Amino acid sequence: MASPRTPVSPPELPEKNFQYRQVQYWDQRYKDAADSGPYEWFGDFASFRALLEPELCPEDRILVLGCGNSALSYELFLGGFPNVTSVDYSPVVVAAMQVRYAHVPSLRWETMDVRALDFPSGSFDVVLEKGTLDAMLAGEPDPWNVSSEGVHTVDQVLSEVGFQKRTRQLFGSHTQLELVLAGLILVLAALLLGCLVALWVHRDPAHSTCVTEACIRVAGKILESLDRGVSPCQDFYQFSCGGWIRRNPLPNGRSRWNTFNSLWDQNQAILKHLLENTTFNSSSEAERKTRSFYLSCLQSERIEKLGAKPLRDLIDKIGGWNITGPWDEDSFMDVLKAVAGTYRATPFFTVYVSADSKSSNSNIIQVDQSGLFLPSRDYYLNRTANEKVLTAYLDYMVELGVLLGGQPTSTREQMQQVLELEIQLANITVPQDQRRDEEKIYHKMSISELQALAPAVDWLEFLSFLLSPLELGDSEPVVVYGTEYLQQVSELINRTEPSILNNYLIWNLVQKTTSSLDQRFETAQEKLLETLYGTKKSCTPRWQTCISNTDDALGFALGSLFVKATFDRQSKEIAEGMINEIRSAFEETLGDLVWMDEKTRLAAKEKADAIYDMIGFPDFILEPKELDDVYDGYEVSEDSFFQNMLNLYNFSAKVMADQLRKPPSRDQWSMTPQTVNAYYLPTKNEIVFPAGILQAPFYAHNHPKALNFGGIGVVMGHELTHAFDDQGREYDKEGNLRPWWQNESLTAFQNHTACMEEQYSQYQVNGERLNGLQTLGENIADNGGLKAAYNAYKAWLRKHGEEQPLPAVGLTNHQLFFVGFAQVWCSVRTPESSHEGLVTDPHSPARFRVLGTLSNSRDFLRHFGCPVGSPMNPGQLCEVW
């Protein structure tokens, strides 16, 4: 449930300043505001988040003094700080807040005078207040010569909660008087701002500036993210995000932080509340399974007590591991079937069931390259540059082997052999930028033909085990992506010693399962992640890890809880309307392309018309019987987290087998409803926008349309344009991989994409160039999505007229569209994480998703007046759509 957000007018000020100290004034004020939303003094939680989070841990007991009807306490809860007590000496507002947030039991509300707090000593770790101490000083006759009584009152409150020492640590050696004066300056600044707003409204009877609470709030967020010291034509990313970057240092334990991470943290807090406070008596069985799974993950004491035993027992059951004890030397196929079949690890290759790209109405077995633990083959092959990572990885392998019972010296020797095998795998793995032409890498063959291609594996035996109880024969069709890779893998298996093969297979199982074991395994992984991504050990609570695990295991059952509690059905209708507006704008662009012939243009328009959109969630999650059917057969217990994970792997294999003889279903989403993301699926020609992304800053019903089109509108345009990027354009309107372009148009398309590939290949991060080919599809989608969304916004303006501008930001609504787009991508990353993104991510880094796209936008250059030759207007524009 979201915090109430009805617009709030500025409150009536008391006749005399000292009335701020009288409970009668506040009681009357809150009675008058009974139907209004929260009123925030000096800003909301987001305004101070960057300052607060370094001082807070999720376990902190927080006291909020003088809470009023602010949403601060609830927003702290949503931000991952659930233990909040709020006090105010107006019983009227306390009663109102108890009712408003009755659905959040961890929030406590007390009627209390801050000058006489009735809490035991040591009850709180952190104390927050916004203006309460200033209000206590409101009766001072001379704000520049505060009376000793006034200073004593402030000091008394701080001492009462044991906060005085911490305050001095935060503010150094400043005197109490200096601290009080600092507070008074904030009050005066707030009053001055109020006067300026009132003066503006008075001088402009037409109220041309939007002064609703939503407009004021979002204007504040935009302003605090901007860096006005940078010209927008010099560096628009820094102009739009410089303030945000200063205010958002990387949280502990994170290698990157951005809007997506922030929203996912917020969604996790909501899911935590739902799992811990929902009465599941009338829920579906699938929803009850989410709670049982989540609780099993939270049982840290039991997990610690079991230690490594669950995995050691599993290894023994499979046939042993040469690193830790006896093993069966003739068991390669049996171990491969167990590791890759029963427990769904991916040594050497990955096997899955999905829609046939050339016959999208049917599912087919598919085989592709896999088998590397590190994020990219580059980490194995560029050994000089990645020596630290390879050393840390080997140390991690050895530490886990020893934790599972191996001897340090022999474990290191054998793990070195496993690492060398992975390096050989990396050598034959095809780089992602060489796999972009799906027509070239798609190879359909029978199992018998696959057997001839890669004879080291008994494919009929393996696939029959994997897809049991289905009966397969030698003629069963299979799609292989990368025949040369599989051929070389087969040769690699044949020339590798059986003991090394066994160690490698079991190592894949160990990688898959150690996250379900005790803290020692987590600590070992943290050391590797620090080297790989630059992360530091964090105080990330166990519940947050468990929410992610529950989402992975039972994401759609969890999504049912999330959607019922948070999703506004009106958002779905509005999103549908926006998609249609953006589709129309894209199709108008198709009509203007001079390089496309008429036959290809008509087929492209038909494909755009045929794109199917899915908004919010699949319908089945709100039908208890259908939802239960999805997870029927998955056994979940509160007693064993490790066994729940093993059951999940086995269950997913059965689900995969069940899909093979069925046609693909539109209800089968690739993302759960709470996910903060979106995607395009070419074999269904569909775009999907989960509920998790349909919220601010991407979308809010009371935000200016300029921001909504610049936020979720660009995301919608991006996903729609994927249907026509260098890979999506190979699929027709039915989702089938086939050539449907005329040769002349295809040649022209490739010339335009070559410009974009070259453009992005010139950008650098920490002296390392982007791969313009690897990121080509996403760059095409970014550029096309921005153009379609902006054209849709212009069409909306023609129909509805100009919007009121936001106060204080000094931007036209057209400029606001581009700032809104850019601020969605404000981001901070460690250097290690930035490198990992360059070698693995098909997206460009956030900075260049903004700079690259806008420097190609004629509309942006016109509205910001960037002259040719300025950094944002280099003179040559790359346009595809």
UniProtKB/Swiss-Prot annotation:
Disruption phenotype: Eef1akmt4-Ece2 and Ece2 double mutant mice are fertile and healthy, and do not display any abnormality in terms of growth or aging.
Tissue-wise expression: Expressed at high levels in central nervous system. Expressed in adrenal glands, ovary and uterus, and at low levels in heart.
Role according to the record: Converts big endothelin-1 to endothelin-1. May also have methyltransferase activity. May play a role in amyloid-beta processing.
Molecular functions (GO terms): metal ion binding; metalloendopeptidase activity; methyltransferase activity
Positions contributing to S-adenosyl-L-methionine binding: 26, 30, 41, 66, 88-89, 113-114, 130
Record organism: Mus musculus
Cited InterPro entries: MetalloPept_cat_dom_sf, Methyltransf_25, Peptidase_M13, Peptidase_M13_C, Peptidase_M13_dom_2, Peptidase_M13_N, SAM-dependent_MTases_sf
Assigned GO CC terms: cytoplasmic vesicle membrane; Golgi membrane; trans-Golgi network; transport vesicle membrane
Topological type in the membrane: Single-pass type II membrane protein
Name assigned to this protein: EEF1AKMT4-ECE2 readthrough transcript protein
Span list, region Methyltransferase-like region: 1-160
Names of required cofactors: Zn(2+)
Transmembrane segments: 179-199
Reaction catalyzed: Hydrolysis of the 21-Trp-|-Val-22 bond in big endothelin to form endothelin 1
